[in-house]
């Protein structure tokens, strides 16, 4: 009885790990929203609406403000 229980648990663990591989890995993705104005929280609101992420205005090397959206994605 204990061998069959051990085998059953082992099979369940193997199947669970296979399902996790099929579903993909979660990672942090980044997207630049070039058409977004960086005033009055529009960057944060648009990023939240599009990808349920967090948006932040950052300054580029040429001193332009761009909206950078960070969100969780599956790769």
Curated annotation (Swiss-Prot):
Q: Which InterPro entries match?
A: DEFL
Q: Where in the cell is it found?
A: Secreted
Question: Signal sequence span per UniProt?
Answer: 1-24
Pfam families to which the protein is assigned, alphabetical: SLR1-BP
> What gene name is listed for this protein?
LCR6
Instruction: Provide the family line.
Output: Belongs to the DEFL family.
> From its record, what is one biological process in GO terms?
killing of cells of another organism
Q: What is this protein called?
A: Putative defensin-like protein 126
Enumerate the transmembrane spans: none
Q: Which cysteines are joined by disulfide bonds?
A: 29-73, 38-57, 43-67, 47-69
Gene Ontology CC terms: extracellular region
Provide this UniProt record's keywords sorted from A to Z: Antimicrobial, Disulfide bond, Fungicide, Plant defense, Secreted, Signal
Using the record for this protein, list the coiled-coil segments as residue ranges, or answer none: none
